[in-house]
Amino acid sequence: LNNGRVAFNAGVKAVDMLDAVLETNITCVNGASVLSPLRRSKDEQELDFLRAASRNNDAVMEDLKNFIRPGVTEKDIAKHIMFLHEKRGGVPRYPVVASGINGSMPHYGGQDNRIIQNKDIIIVDTGAWYNSYNCDMTRMFFIGDPTEEQKKVYRIVLEAQNVGEEEATLGAIPEDIDNKARKVIETAGYGAAFTHRLGHGTGMDPHEDPFIVAGNKRPLEVGNCFSIEPGIYLKGAFGVRIENLIAITETGPEVLNKLDKEMIIL
């Protein structure tokens, strides 16, 4: 490879790239512009990998119901999720486990390691690679009966998520899908609490084209696979997010996650 040109994906850390090329005459170039269009639309085999990965994710989330309880920590839950994925042959990403007030931070990274308590509400966002293809899903766990406010917020997020799935059809504009799902939350008075895009593509990379976000006007195509994941995050209180993966197929949109979207009350 001396004197050659190597394109690096956006997911490669600069320090790793330097380690790989310092002793060579390789010219490094940004490969994201090359790889992104190639990964945007999946063929049928790739979609089958994503279907199988999502079935495994469903099973992991189902098994998790038997583990979450007062007294365990967020980190305990995260480690158990990774164990469940590994047991099924997956290579897990570190999951989001955000309980109580931590759920009010959309991108909470587990730094608090809070102990689960009675009456907690917990965001669990998990995924893993199976056959090199990534799955992704978010569900909500409630320790005991939710409050009236939690029920209200959950119903709003669920309605927005359902609208997002219904609008995600062949030829639909991602920006329009985001707008219509977001409108549900805005109309309910929580627009300022929905602070991120509606969804992202997934495949070999957990976050890739197409992005379901304002400004993306490229119509959805056969082979696209992406998340629909609206959320409401109430500062200092709690958060709610619900996420499924959708694939655009020759016969129409297909929801890859089969696990029920109703509240999981333990």
Task: Tell me the role of every PLM-derived stretch.
Residues 1-266:
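Active-site neighborhoods and metal-handling regions in enzymes and metal-associated proteins
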